[in-house]
């Protein structure tokens, strides 16, 4: 299935909050996490602040928002150009497989190139086989394994533990 040619990818605007929030919650539900509302409010404010290195976009099919993407530009010790971390990507279940995920990724590629970034990269859960089929077509697997240590207990918690 291919994306509807009328699907538009548009940078987030203040008036998009009501369309963004259900997608943001759907993304959290997909990964079985419960992000506190104050963190979501801070995230929204950062996404709209041009002084912040984070940005986002929504995919629109007509009047309906059907996908979101957030990305963060940051310095790298390996290049003089910045890197772009594609942190969040979510497409409504009803339109998955239609090419919207690819369009959102391509939007990030274009934004990162415009900003002079040397690389776009992202993570996904090892069980997200459907998404990985797309990712294998639009990027290269790095072979790296992520390790992490949460330093602020309770700020980011699985929904099962909330």
Task: Give, region by region, the residue ranges found by the protein language model.
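Conserved acetyl-CoA-binding loop-helix of GNAT-fold acetyltransferases
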Residues: 91, 97-110
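Conserved beta-strand in the GNAT
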Residues: 56-58, 64-73
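Conserved GNAT-fold acetyl-CoA-binding loop/helix
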Residues: 21-46
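A conserved beta-turn-beta hairpin within the catalytic core of GNAT-like acetyltransferases
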Residues: 64, 74-86, 96, 143
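Conserved GNAT acetyl-CoA-binding A-motif
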Residues: 113-123
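A short beta-loop-alpha structural element at the N-terminal edge
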Residues: 8-22
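A short helix-loop-beta-strand connector motif used in the catalytic cores of GNAT acetyltransferases and
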Residues: 46-58, 85, 141-143
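Conserved active-site alpha-helix within GNAT-family acetyltransferase domains
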Residues: 102, 126-145
């Amino acid at each position: 299935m291919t994306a509807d040619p009328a699907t538009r990818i548009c940078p987030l605007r203040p008036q998009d909050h009501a369309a963004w929030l259900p997608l943001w919650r759907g993304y959290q539900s997909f990964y079985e996490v419960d992000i506190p509302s104050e963190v979501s409010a801070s995230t929204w404010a950062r996404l709209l602040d041009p002084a912040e290195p984070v940005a986002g976009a929504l995919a629109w099919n007509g009047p309906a928002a059907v996908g979101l993407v957030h990305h963060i530009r940051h310095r790298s010790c390996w290049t003089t150009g910045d890197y772009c971390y594609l942190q969040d990507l979510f497409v409504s279940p009803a339109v998955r497989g239609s090419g919207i995920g690819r369009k959102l990724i391509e939007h990030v590629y274009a934004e990162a190139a415009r900003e002079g970034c040397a690389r776009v990269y992202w993570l996904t859960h090892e069980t997200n086989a459907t998404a990985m089929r797309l990712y294998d077509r639009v990027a290269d697997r790095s072979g790296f394994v992520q390790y992490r240590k949460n330093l602020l207990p309770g700020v980011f918690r699985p929904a099962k533990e909330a």
